[in-house]
């Protein structure tokens, strides 16, 4: 029986938990959260899912156990301000073979290097859950645009740029193979807004980036309205338009005389994605999420300029990243 631990049973953590119910391997699952209310909600969500191939062993506890048995897979789904501390505590308490971290990874620059060294020391293979690259429609985009210079445009209302820009920068890195980029914050609205999660901030306006291979990214979050998220990717050889809310996308390619064709673009929920990720990791020792070292680089190239922009436009000066 494989041991799986989830730390943080809030919105995203409980979705990871739901996904584990369908994993076709016998699991011993421990859910850890300081809030008994969150644990109760997570348990209810887990029990609401269809019965899987195996009835997994379940435990719900409020703290990390010291000197526990080796863990096959841990998923840390806390907020960014607690994740480095929790990761350190876990790795000092048990041998963890595989680890999935949520984004935004951490809220302090120093944590990125410190946790990276700890992961090497403990030989813990680690990925970051930025799942566009494992969603079928976005995975296939790599076939259309691989190693090309692309234009990548996303628009929509209330996207939450601090939270979600990392998804798109990671996807561009996945498509193009280029991980070096610079962002331009001049199009952001100067005053940040409160994020959905208490104590964190968000940006509206337009955030742009230029990758080393010449690819350009433009992400626009309208502060009002209900404009759906539309993703447009184009190169000299292909054009892609995706409407996530409808599960639809259209593709035109030069070798098809630029004729538009509708393609399937269903976006699977986290409660299904994690099922496949867990099965792949436990059976093969790998998955298609971005690995920690690469994601650390992609994170910091975004977070440092955002912090500088925030300090330039705020009376309060931030030494950390108030994003999650």
PLM regions and their residue ranges:
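N-terminal Rossmann-like dinucleotide-binding module
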Residues: 1-51
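Rossmann-like NAD(P)H-binding beta-loop-alpha module
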Residues: 136-151
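C-terminal helix-rich "cap/oligomerization" subdomain common to oxidoreductases
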Residues: 26, 45-46, 73-76, 279-324
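Beta-strand-loop-alpha-helix segment that lines the small-molecule cofactor/substrate pocket
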Residues: 72-80, 84-133
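Amphipathic, non-transmembrane alpha-helical secondary structure
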Residues: 14, 18, 65-66, 84-92, ...
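Short acidic low-complexity segments
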Residues: 53-70
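Rossmann-like dinucleotide-binding domain that binds NAD(P)(H)
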Residues: 151-228, 293
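NAD(P)-dinucleotide binding in Rossmann-like oxidoreductases
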Residues: 197-200, 212-278, 286-293
């Amino acid at each position: 029986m494989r041991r799986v631990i989830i730390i943080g049973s809030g919105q995203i953590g409980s979705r990871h938990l739901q996904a584990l119910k369908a994993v076709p391997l016998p699991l011993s699952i421990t859910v850890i959260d300081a809030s008994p209310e969150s644990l109760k909600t997570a348990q209810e969500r887990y029990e609401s899912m269809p019965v899987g191939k195996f009835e997994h062993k379940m435990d719900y506890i409020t703290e990390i156990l010291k000197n526990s048995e080796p863990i096959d897979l841990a998923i840390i789904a806390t907020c960014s301000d607690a994740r480095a501390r929790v990761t350190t505590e876990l790795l000092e308490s048990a041998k963890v073979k595989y680890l999935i971290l949520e984004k935004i990874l951490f809220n302090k620059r120093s944590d990125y290097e410190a946790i990276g060294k700890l992961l090497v020391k403990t030989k813990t293979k680690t990925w970051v859950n930025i799942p566009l690259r494992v969603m079928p429609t976005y995975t296939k985009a790599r076939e259309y645009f691989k190693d090309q210079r692309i234009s990548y445009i996303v628009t929509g209302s209330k996207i939450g740029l601090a939270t979600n820009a990392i998804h798109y920068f990671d996807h561009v890195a996945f498509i193009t193979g280029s991980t070096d980029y610079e962002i331009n914050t001049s199009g952001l609205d100067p005053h940040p807004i409160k994020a959905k999660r208490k104590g964190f901030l968000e940006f509206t306006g337009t955030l742009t980036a230029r990758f080393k291979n010449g690819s350009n990214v433009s992400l626009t979050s309208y502060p009002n309205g209900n404009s759906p998220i539309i993703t447009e990717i184009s190169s000299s050889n292909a054009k892609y338009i995706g409407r996530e809310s409808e599960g639809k996308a259209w593709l035109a390619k030069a070798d098809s005389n630029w004729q538009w064709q509708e393609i399937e673009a269903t976006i699977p929920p986290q409660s299904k994605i994690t099922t496949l990720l867990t099965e792949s990791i436990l059976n093969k020792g790998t998955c298609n999420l971005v690995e920690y070292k690469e994601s650390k680089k992609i994170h910091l190239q975004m977070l440092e300029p955002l912090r500088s922009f925030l300090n330039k436009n705020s009376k309060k000066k931030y030494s950390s990243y108030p994003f999650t």
